[in-house]
Amino acid sequence: MSMPLSNALQSQIITDAHFLHHPIVDSEFTRKLKYARMDSENIYLPPLTRGNNHNYDGKSVVEIRKLDISKEPWPFNYVTGACRESDGITTTGRMLYRNLKITSALDEIYGGICKKAHATTELAEGLRLNLFMKSPFDPVEDYTVHEITLGPGCNVPGYAGTTIGYISTLPASQAKRWTNEQPRIDIYIDQIMTVTGVANSSGFALAALLNANIELGNDPIIGIEAYPGTAEIHAKMGYKVIPGDENAPLKRMTLQPSSLPELFELKNGEWNYIGK
């Protein structure tokens, strides 16, 4: 008689299966894109090694995986398409100079409605604008794209491995509006998008991002730029507007987890989000 799988083991299997080959998406992108056969099975990098490169938040609620995005557009199209196909999401839309039109199928998670397709499409088009429509005189920056998924510690049967958002980062030295005159930053977040309906998803994602960059030490500082109307949202996560930007339409903000013990804790070398 076969033994029933534990929730933890079942979650791990689901998590692993989420990152396997996507034959439906493969076929579609191979048909549409001339070079879509190149290394398509390697678009997803393996999870970072546990230890110094641990890529979960401290409770394994959220996991971050770095995506292998090249300088050509088709791998990014492939990745976002694979994520939508895997999650049962249908998305159409495009963004031209911030004119974003999206239609999407919605699904339920944590008893709420998640607009995963919105996050996927907005990030895809924003990065495409940044990566592939630049002037030859303006070199492409070294973007790192992180896919945020629910980890085996999410305690929601069947949802481990589900994509809930994306973070794209740049080396702090490439944050164009940050100079030596501004407060120090170690990580610059160019874009962060997480779905609605997953409690504290942004907090868990930030903890996982810190753990994926644990070489920055015990006192890292994250920098971000807040568009009009979003500074208040970032402030709830502990971000503070830098001096001089209080009345600016585009506010530069910093997050120093070590100064926010009510939101973040560093335990056994790992960051954990403990906000309510």
Curated annotation (Swiss-Prot):
This is Uncharacterized protein YjiC. Pfam families: DUF2686. The gene is yjiC. The lineage of its organism: Bacteria, Pseudomonadati, Pseudomonadota, Gammaproteobacteria, Enterobacterales. InterPro entries: DUF2686. To E.coli YjfZ. It comes from Escherichia coli (strain K12).
